[in-house]
Amino acid sequence: MTFAVSVGGRRVDCEPGQTLLEAFLRGGVWMPNSCNQGTCGTCKLQVLSGEVDHGGAPEDTLSAEERASGLALACQARPLADTEVRSTADAGRVTHPLRDLTATVLEVADIARDTRRVLLGLAEPLAFEAGQYVELVVPGSGARRQYSLANTADEDKVLELHVRRVPGGVATDGWLFDGLAAGDRVEATGPLGDFHLPPPDEDDGGPMVLIGGGTGLAPLVGIARTALARHPSREVLLYHGVRGAADLYDLGRFAEIAEEHPGFRFVPVLSDEPDPAYRGGFPTDAFVEDVPSGRGWSGWLCGPPAMVEAGVKAFKRRRMSPRRIHREKFTPAS
């Protein structure tokens, strides 16, 4: 049965089986979201009227007390009646609608140790913001896996994904690293996620630091390129934390960006396998060494939870404003 759901004065229809988050995003109504698995709590909202089924919302993300008080996770909750909710102050603004996509694989290339670049071609342009992600449907399993977009929004008919092999992973070992080839069809949904730049009229052109761990580099590439397109002379530091030199990729691309934009600097940092050509240690520590004060800077973090948390501490240590800190944790698939 279809129910009407509303937030911030905007109303959409929620079709059978859809979560509140999916209904709002498909209707072009923005709702804070990140993991889409119920683990991060970004999409937590207040149910003002109506009733919802909380689905698979984990207890550690949405406690029994919170459920009793009317809180819900938009990515897990499904309405059981017409429902009105309250979210953040910006919820309800128009955004890029969530879409079902059928893409054609244009290229599959090994670019680093256990890392592949996958290029997907679309018949119709996809409106998105650099830094958002798409969900791929794993053939034959019904499983869905999330991959950040590495390209910019003007490249709207090609989706660039950076994929790291997960031993035993249903998506990587069973598909993306074993059998996926140019010409294959891929089913996906997108765009999703809040990890992107503010609108151009809210972007002050100030200095930025972006820290990515492993393939957490992917969304940062699109964000950095978009930021430089808006303000070509801005200072942008992009740190890539990996285990060893064999895990680095796209060094030529970053050299070209640096040549075009003198304020851009790419800093690889190796944690486990020392190499005299690169810095050792952790990218979050490298930032602390390089930037005496983070006042006026904005910070972007993407990668494993431990790295992201270390980055938040590093930014705060350098007195970066909390409202300028943006993060995207790579969490295990549920």
UniProtKB/Swiss-Prot annotation:
Q: Is Iron-sulfur among the key words of this record?
A: yes
Quote the protein name from its UniProt record: Aromatic O-demethylase, reductase subunit
**Among the record's GO biological process terms, what is one?**
catabolic process
**Lineage top rank: taxon:** Bacteria
Domain FAD-binding FR-type per the UniProt entry, residue ranges: 98-198
Record-listed [2Fe-2S] cluster binding positions: 35, 40, 43, 75
Anything noted about its domains? GcoB has an unusual three-domain structure, with an N-terminal 2Fe-2S domain and a C-terminal region that consists of an FAD-binding domain followed by an NADH-binding domain.
| UniProt remark on cofactor binding | Binds 1 FAD per subunit.
Catalyzed reactions per annotation: 2 oxidized [cytochrome P450] + NADH = 2 reduced [cytochrome P450] + NAD(+) + H(+)
Annotated 2Fe-2S ferredoxin-type domain ranges read 1-91
The organism's lineage is: Bacteria, Bacillati, Actinomycetota, Actinomycetes, Pseudonocardiales
Q: Which UniProt keywords apply?
A: 2Fe-2S, Aromatic hydrocarbons catabolism, Electron transport, FAD, Flavoprotein, Iron, Iron-sulfur, Metal-binding, NAD, Oxidoreductase, Transport
Residues binding FAD are: 145-148, 162-164, 170-172, 215, 330, 334
Q: Kindly indicate whether the keyword Electron transport belongs to this entry.
A: yes
Q: Which cofactor does it need?
A: FAD; [2Fe-2S] cluster
**Enzyme Commission number, as recorded:** 1.6.2.-
Query: How is the subunit organization of this protein annotated in UniProt?
Result: Monomer. Forms a heterodimer with GcoA.
Function (record text)? Part of a two-component P450 system that efficiently O-demethylates diverse aromatic substrates such as guaiacol and a wide variety of lignin-derived monomers. Is likely involved in lignin degradation, allowing Amycolatopsis sp. ATCC 39116 to catabolize plant biomass. GcoB transfers electrons from NADH to the cytochrome P450 subunit GcoA. Highly prefers NADH over NADPH as the electron donor.
Listed pathway(s): Aromatic compound metabolism
A GO MF annotation of the entry reads:
oxidoreductase activity
The UniProt gene name for this protein comes to gcoB
For this protein, the record's InterPro entries field holds:
2Fe-2S_ferredoxin-like_sf, 2Fe-2S_ferredoxin-type, 2Fe2S_fd_BS, Beta-grasp_dom_sf, Cbr1-like_FAD-bd_dom, FAD-bd_FR_type, Flavoprot_Pyr_Nucl_cyt_Rdtase, FNR_nucleotide-bd
